[in-house]
A protein has these predicted regions:
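Fold-independent oxyanion-binding glycine-rich loops
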Residues: 28-31, 53-56, 75, 82, ...
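Structured adenosyl-cofactor binding patch, chiefly the S-adenosyl-L-methionine
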Residues: 59, 63-110
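Internal, active-site/partner-interface "lid" segment
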Residues: 84, 96-136
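SAM-dependent methyltransferases
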Residues: 125-188
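Alpha-helical scaffold segments in soluble metabolic enzymes
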Residues: 10, 14, 88, 92, ...
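S-adenosyl-L-methionine/SAH cofactor-binding core of RNA-modifying enzymes
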Residues: 2-55, 61, 98
Length: 188
């Protein structure tokens, strides 16, 4: 089943007030460019976004050519419709907007914001099921805690997503400390 162009175009016209209001229309499709955190950041700076969600076979190509500004995919797999990808995109964008997160700088320390995955997170108790929180996190030495977090982030990225480190290294984006940690990991 392919969605016909007229209902989609009529909806677009209503949303844009017959073209008087410019919106950035994103079609959620597995054929689109894969969503990245950098693109999420860029989209979060735009004023008016509209998501077009196909279903089953998608939408008539003519309406895509007429009104779509960008096609985005959330990964190399197929769902029955674009609704879930649109929700994922909306959530990832909204959390970057002022007032959404309690700590507005929190997202800058999370996985994929830069070129590292996030370091491991722990809560209390200090020991659970025989697994202990690393002692350094109880040390009170913020410098040591920061260094541990950086080492863990680089190590985790090296083990789970080496492609991210390789890209950052090739682009010259690694700090001196990150490069030293990476070099040490490679020498093991």
């Amino acid at each position: 089943m392919v969605m016909q162009p007229n209902p989609i175009y009529d909806c677009y016209q209503a949303v844009t007030e017959e073209g008087a209001r410019k919106c950035h229309l994103i079609y959620m499709t597995p054929q689109g460019k894969t969503l990245t955190q950098e693109r999420v950041r860029e989209l979060s700076e735009m004023d008016d976004l509209v998501f077009l969600c196909g279903h089953y076979e998608g939408v008539d190509e003519r309406v895509i050519e007429e009104i779509v500004d960008e096609e985005i995919s959330i990964g190399d797999y197929v769902l029955t419709g674009g609704e879930l990808p649109a929700l994922i995109l909306a959530d990832s964008i909204s959390r970057m907007l002022p007032g959404v997160l309690a700590n507005e700088d929190a997202f800058t320390e999370e996985s994929h914001y830069g070129h590292l995955l996030e370091y491991p997170q722990y809560t209390r108790p200090a020991e659970w099921q025989g697994r202990e929180v690393p002692d350094v996190l109880f040390s009170g030495d913020h410098g040591k805690v920061d260094r541990w977090r950086l080492e863990q982030a680089v190590t985790r990225t090296f083990e789970r997503r080496p492609d991210m480190l390789e890209a950052a290294e090739a682009a010259g984006e690694l700090t001196k400390e990150e490069q030293e940690i990476l070099d040490a990991l490679r020498s093991v």
